[in-house]
Structure formats: C-alpha cells, structure tokens
Amino acid sequence: MKRRLVLFLMLMVQFFMAQNKVEDYLHLGDKYRFDNKDYKLVWSSHPASNFYKQEYILPNENVEKYKRLILIDFIEGDLAPKDVLSSLVNNLENSKKQNPIINYQMYEREDEYMLDFIISKNSQDGKEVLILERNVYRYFRINTPKRKGVLLFGVSDRAYTKKEMDNMFSVLKNKKLDLVNKVIQIEVPKIK
C-alpha cells in the first residue's frame, strides 16, 4: 500500500511538472536580452490557435512577484497593430472610471504603435494600492513568408511597497521617457 502511494505521488508530481512546462512557441530562445540584462523564459501559453504568449524575468525573480517582466505576444492573422492596441485602450478607458491611477499615453510612428500605461491592483475597499504596474508595449506588424500578424513586445515594471511605488512615481515624473526610449530601440524580435 505504501509503495502504491509513493508511486501515485511520483506520478502526480510528474503530471504537474508537465503542466508547467514552458514552451518556446515563438522560437526566441530561453533567454532574452534587454537593457544589458538576460531575462529567462519562465512562462508561455498558446491560448488560441492564432495567439502565443511568452514571459521572461531575471533569474533571481519570481513570476508571481517580479520587479520587471518582458512579455512577447504574437497574434497571427491579417491584423493591424492599431486594431490590437485599440482594444487595450478601450479597456483602460473603461477601467479609469473606477480607478483614477490608470493613465496612458500612446505613441505612433508609421505602422508601429507604443502604449505607455499605469495600472494598479487595489484593496477591496479601494483605499490601498497593493500593486502598481507600469507597462510599455510596442506593437509591430509582422509580414514574412512564414508568419503574418501583430507582435507585441512589452516591459512591465511592478512596485509592491509604498517606497517602491514612490520611486516608480518619481521615475515617471523625472525619467518617464527612459524606458520608452529603450523599448523604441529594440530590434523586432525574430519569431519563426
């Protein structure tokens, strides 16, 4: 009986490990270099037949409580970057009605778009900010013989404590364009 229980537990562990397997759907590798740091692929998803998501964090961070996360999404199809972006902008506009912290700025250059936005997760009573998150998303049109669609490269910075949040607001006030410029300078990730 004890032996069966051990075998059962080992099989369950393997099952759950298989469920958490990270797949490099976009063939970008298990590392991504941004701002002179190497980020490790820690999560991926293929939630629809034409939609792929990959997330990278620094090796010493946890995906549940990261300081900076790199995300790369690809939506396959005959889509324009502006169409993909507009649904997020609509969501932000709707959320702003209940959350005054939410703010965004959009940038446009040729057929590329960037969205720099702040969101927060608040306590149930709305009196306390639990997580402050700043995101800079850059949308590219991909049109190669093998792939056609919209690629999103994003950087997500999070703050969890009052000190971290004050620092984030200070950066937004004094050095807001630093992160925007770093995201502008990246080359389009070469997905396969």
Residue locations for each model-derived region?
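Sec-dependent signal peptide recognition
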Residues: K2-F8
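Hydrophobic h-region of N-terminal signal peptides that target proteins for export
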Residues: M10-A18
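N-terminal "mature-domain start" segment
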Residues: Q19-S49
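Secretory pathway targeting signatures of secreted, lumenal, and periplasmic proteins
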Residues: K37-G77
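Surface-exposed patches in mature extracellular/periplasmic domains of secreted proteins
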Residues: V42-S44, N99-M106
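Mid-chain, structured segments of secreted extracytoplasmic proteins
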Residues: Y66-N103
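Short, hydrophobic/aromatic-rich segments at coil-to-beta transitions
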Residues: E110-F117
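Short, well-structured beta-strand
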Residues: I118-I191
